[in-house]
Regions:
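Nucleotide-sugar donor-binding/catalytic module of glycosyltransferases
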Residues: 1-108
Length: 108
């Protein structure tokens, strides 16, 4: 039996630390059951460091990331509502950009 496909949903805004974002995203990319899609909501303009981290991940995993961008910060609630709408898989794994997931978090 195959594993169900799932989306990772994460929001990021300008006050986040790029190194935390990198660690958080990586912790989901190395899951025993890897994500089928990664929806990242840019809640307002970001720092160069955050944009750089996101660009690196898009280069490393072409086609995995779906970026939803807003020109101004609208808050976590709005970002997540819009992010859920952008997810296309039957299961959504919610992550904050400063969370770390155990490698077996998505184990079925």
């Amino acid at each position: 039996m195959g594993h169900p496909e799932y989306s990772v949903l994460m929001s990021v805004y300008a006050k986040e630390r790029p190194e935390w974002l990198r660690e958080s995203v990586r912790s989901m990319l190395v899951q025993t059951v890897p994500p089928s899609e990664f929806v990242l909501v840019e809640d307002g303009p970001l720092t160069d460091g955050l944009y750089g981290a996101i660009e690196d991940f898009e280069s490393e995993r072409p086609g995995l990331f779906k970026i939803v961008s807003y020109p101004e910060n609208k808050g976590l609630g709005h970002a997540l509502r819009e992010g859920v709408s952008a997810c296309t898989k039957p299961v959504i794994a919610r992550m904050d950009s400063d969370d770390l997931a155990r490698p077996d978090r998505m184990k079925v």
